[in-house]
A protein has these predicted regions:
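Surface-exposed, secretory/extracytoplasmic low-complexity segments enriched in Ser/Thr/Asn/Gly/Pro
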Residues: 1-177, 182, 229-231, 236-242, ...
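Active-site scaffold segments
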Residues: 183-237
Length: 249
């Protein structure tokens, strides 16, 4: 019954075909019984993960300033290998042809092209300027103030996914409690928020008077960002020499 079986995995426009010929090599016979070597199932799923997982991989990002930068971070596709091995074992036991997506521990925006798609928040830490693109259209840009470099709170670069968004949060740390209207964390305790205690943003403020790592934004910009972001939206932070206080093109 395995000889004519076909299981097709789809990842966007890409396909992986597991056919009877390959399944046949996973079988063993004992006492007139056919059994499947489960380690072969796990190995196959592991090979899918190493081919299609994008989390923590390096990828290029074309900045709004023109040049490309390389970013990596926890954002990206990640196959749930344990869950998928169990699902594949079940599909094989049923002996039916199946076309399916693998089980994911984490999803991204796209399988084709860049996994971050065309809706994301772009954060130029050098220029202290950010953008939000929605389906390729720029809907927001704003100066900001990031982590205080002189105190060792430099905001790290990387590609992340927004964790959640919350109104009226109080951000607490050692020796401070800051009430904010809009809170949007994306990298552990680092997130975007309004900063009513500041009246200037951008430039080189961050070097000596920056935040504890968060992206401090003007109220109106934080509000617009809050209204348009969602859990999982890509947040791409980078440094780009030559754009200090630079204008976006």
């Amino acid at each position: 019954r395995y000889a004519n079986m076909t299981i097709i995995y789809t990842m966007g426009s890409k396909k992986e075909i597991l056919d009877g010929e390959q399944i046949h090599t996973w079988l063993s016979y004992a006492d007139g019984q056919v059994s499947i070597d489960e380690s072969k199932i796990s190995e196959y799923v592991k090979s899918l993960a190493s081919k299609y997982n994008t989390a923590y991989s390096k990828r290029t990002f074309k900045t709004s300033y023109g040049p490309e930068v390389e970013v990596s971070g926890f954002y990206g596709w990640r196959i749930d290998q344990q869950a998928e091995a169990a699902a594949l074992k079940e599909a094989l036991a049923e002996g039916k042809n199946v076309t399916k997506e693998p089980a994911y521990a984490q999803k991204a925006a796209s399988h084709d092209g860049n996994d971050y798609g065309n809706t994301y928040v772009e954060v130029n830490l050098t220029a202290q300027h950010l953008f939000m693109y929605k389906e390729g259209q720029k809907i927001l840009e704003s100066d900001f103030v990031s982590g205080n470099v002189s105190k060792g709170y430099t905001t790290p670069p990387g590609i992340f996914g927004l964790t959640y968004k919350q109104r009226d949060a109080t951000l607490k740390g050692q020796g401070y409690a800051s009430p904010v209207k809009f809170w949007m964390p994306f990298n552990g305790g680092i997130g975007f928020h309004d900063a009513s205690w500041r009246n200037t943003f951008g430039g080189t403020i961050y070097k000596k008077s920056g935040s504890h790592g968060c992206i401090n934004m003007p109220y109106a910009a934080a509000k617009t960002l809050f209204e348009n972001v969602y859990a999982g939206i890509p947040v791409i932070c980078y440094n780009l020499a030559g754009t200090e206080n630079g204008q976006a093109t």
